[in-house]
Amino acid sequence: MGIKTPTVHQDQTPVHLRANRGAVSRWLGRTVLSILGWRVEGQIPDLKRLLVIGAPHTSNWDFVLAMATILGLNLRMRWLAKHTIFKRGVVWFMEWLGGIPTDRTQPQAIVESVARLARKGKGVVIGITPEGTRKKALKWKTGFLRLARALDCPILMVAINFPTKTIVIGDLYHPSGDNNYDLVAIKQYYDQFQGIHKDQF
């Protein structure tokens, strides 16, 4: 019997971007991915600041896969999500996972909050879904581009690819300053991937 390839490992994360989670948390992430039949490909770049975007976002399962990936990578990442999902009783768990509740009616406040995070510590990784919804989005929101400028960092494009059951840590994208151009270029990159519900992307 051959040695089974790990689904994900903290060696895929630079030391300075690793969280202080214990071995049990990393085991949980690996186990969830293994049970579901998924694996993580690629390396987190060795940079001080990163804005991570994840797509295609077509299913509630995306959240489970994302959290398992973060735990398995032992990645110290803060991720932005609608404040409405931070329900009483689970807020502590969501925040332990790195969640930051955001009110999308106040985009400037979000940018300022993220910029403050970037000024702290030895490195920061912020995650966001550019589509903003699981439903088919004809036009992506540009907030993540503003966040990248506020952080003064490149965008790491991470993809869910259902046909191969792979989480792909993909290319770095450096925003040009032209939001329309950047959205087209980034969406074209994601055209090669297929979400769990392909008709929603």
Name each model feature, range by range.
Residues 21-57:
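Helix-to-loop junction immediately C-terminal to a conserved catalytic motif
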Residues 27-28, 65, 89, 142-143:
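Short Gly/charged-rich anion-binding patches and loops
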Residues 31, 68, 92, 116, ...:
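Surface-exposed charge patches
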